[in-house]
Amino acid sequence: MKLEPLMEYYANLEPPLAIGDGPFGNRMLVEVKGGGFEGPRLKGKIRELSAADWLIIDSDGVGHLDVRATFETHDGAYIYAQYYGTLVVNEKVQAALAGSGDCDYGETEFFITPRMETGDERYK
């Protein structure tokens, strides 16, 4: 089996909304204000007001991602995207979440399990 990337994805994030400590860790809502994706078979934008991460940082400092978004392809199809995963919450991530820095590609690691759904026959 040969794995090939479907796309590269970027998101413009709002400052997190702190929900606070709960039984699973420190929960926050990180809203996505646009972004995009591009690859050999899929390209387009992230619909504004349709995406967020319900992030939890546990007592070990591991971030647990729960992201949902609506993608709009370059040819007008809508795709629901959801992924769960884990995020290494290092100094770069902490600074970005605090609004005092950026975390660029390659400055942390995260592992996700994506799922996508659409009713558009071109992308089933």
Region locations from a protein language model:
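Beta-strand-enriched cores of mature, soluble protein domains
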Residues: M1-K124
